[in-house]
Amino acid sequence: METAYSVKNIPIRLTYERWYHIIENHDDLASYFHDVLDTVENPEFIMQGNQGTLKATKNIGKKKWLVVIYKELSEEDGFIITSYFLPGKPKGKIIFATVQFLINQ
């Protein structure tokens, strides 16, 4: 198990079981383990997801956005649910954004 810390400094777990689930369904992510963790810790922006989830998002190349869905259960615990690539900037309600992201808009 690996842990990343969200922008609210909450530890977010990525278990090996979850990682295997992610790469089983999204094999294009197989070499992006550390990028998934880094996206939770250093997202360009975070969107509100469904059922209390959050979507940490980072642009990692031309027309390539990494999205990590996670849930903060408490101030001391959270976990990654899944992750995937999108060909364009995700749409949704932004609840956090870096200054650099806002400048580039």
Regions found by a protein language model. Name each.
Residues 1-105:
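Ribonuclease/tRNase effector modules and their secretory precursors
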